[in-house]
Swiss-Prot record:
Keyword Isomerase attributed: no
Protein name: Protein NARROW LEAF 1
Higher taxonomy: Eukaryota, Viridiplantae, Streptophyta, Embryophyta, Tracheophyta
Localization terms from the record: Nucleus, Nucleoplasm; Cytoplasm
Known uses: Utilization of photosynthesis-related QTLs can enhance high-yield breeding and provide a new strategy for achieving increased rice productivity.
The species this protein was found in: Oryza sativa subsp. japonica
Keywords: Cytoplasm, Developmental protein, Nucleus
Composition bias, Basic and acidic residues: 562-572
Gene inactivation effect: Narrow leaf phenotype. Reduced leaf blade width and plant height. Altered internode elongation pattern. Altered vascular patterns in leaves and culms.
Amino acid sequence: MKPSDDKAQLSGLAQSEESSLDVDHQSFPCSPSIQPVASGCTHTENSAAYFLWPTSNLQHCAAEGRANYFGNLQKGLLPRHPGRLPKGQQANSLLDLMTIRAFHSKILRRFSLGTAVGFRIRKGDLTDIPAILVFVARKVHKKWLNPAQCLPAILEGPGGVWCDVDVVEFSYYGAPAQTPKEQMFSELVDKLCGSDECIGSGSQVASHETFGTLGAIVKRRTGNKQVGFLTNHHVAVDLDYPNQKMFHPLPPNLGPGVYLGAVERATSFITDDVWYGIYAGTNPETFVRADGAFIPFADDFDISTVTTVVRGVGDIGDVKVIDLQCPLNSLIGRQVCKVGRSSGHTTGTVMAYALEYNDEKGICFFTDILVVGENRQTFDLEGDSGSLIILTSQDGEKPRPIGIIWGGTANRGRLKLTSDHGPENWTSGVDLGRLLDRLELDIIITNESLQDAVQQQRFALVAAVTSAVGESSGVPVAIPEEKIEEIFEPLGIQIQQLPRHDVAASGTEGEEASNTVVNVEEHQFISNFVGMSPVRDDQDAPRSITNLNNPSEEELAMSLHLGDREPKRLRSDSGSSLDLEK
């Protein structure tokens, strides 16, 4: 649509000397693609993960409902008085700014590459003036534009709440830029990439095709309380493969490494009303980038090698939940840091929130956090995806995580914040609190909490086994507390020497019990078929099913797996052979 088509709507709005733009570019950068690591490895196991697909749960989830919502907001809009400041209250929260922007999204979308909410920027520095940031390809003086090409200096929303409009120049590449291949070399980076004896936030994790950064140690809130870690969806998931395994530091096809586990649940996009709890835009096709994946640690992974301490930062506090109704300065302008496997420890500033852009197909996308590196330094490099974005300590409190990185230098452009410096790199992140809620996870921030979480996982598994055996035999089965340590391996899935409590089971009953136990799973999620490492020693192999059919009078031995595993077929080396589990 031409700018002149909207002249009637804009003619009565105040003009800003900074509100100049190039209307030839009407699309914003799409999500960056991660360059894969070459791999010739094939997979012989099956696994399936639970993926959260974008859905809407508000009462008005259809296009008509969204239109009615904004139509009702229109009723609360006070009459405009061109050239004068509004008499209503100035916006002071993220919610205020997001509501004003959504209300005027049609105008803003027509003449910009994208928008965000935050404070006005002057000479590269943030002020304390609430504003909607409008990204344009080129800023020129309003003298060289016709009135229809100028954005208003102030926008007013429902109830008379108003804010400034700040135009920020965005150097648009038009296509994803070549991702920088440089890597910072330091003792910290060396440790994160495998030279340390521990693994934790910032450590390198890799699939067969990609590598990235471990974000946080987490646990499931429900079900069997699995302990694992969080990283990006695009780091951990490749739907061209039947399984989604993760290793540290490298997968077996590229070098030495330990099998960490396989993706149990993941999400990539969520509708705006589910993510924010409000309609963030008038476009019915509106989605938020929720790039996250949960990988529970494998059953035979040594949990003692996991640490909750963030290298280069230390102990961290609880997640900083971003409340849309909190004051802007609780987030915008705050100093942050991150620790990633490529660039190590870097610092930056939160410049904006809820970045909005539309692609060429007419779909509206949001990404939560926009960070610019300190002193015009890059905040992240390729491979840092998944890193925690951490608020630096303030007033003696511990640093608190607020997000995870999902994109950075591979974005399609850079921000020009000052006229005397060139464009700067920017990094986009996912709101950590909202991501954990969607994946039903809790972050683990102390080693003591980690041990407690592992114990809870063990108890949950014992309870599941006890319930399954009791339902099968019709007789309650109790497990003595002193036997718990004998039951579990590092994360506890192999069960040994369960007392019979004088239950006389026939061969048929034993077979039914074994079938019941083997298929124990939480029906809300698809079971994971790769709980164990691809290769295990014979001493760890489960006992055969015949032992269940012919139990001794002293004990009943059984094996529990979270989902059936397909037979494995491995290459045999000359001069050696492996007995494989069936």
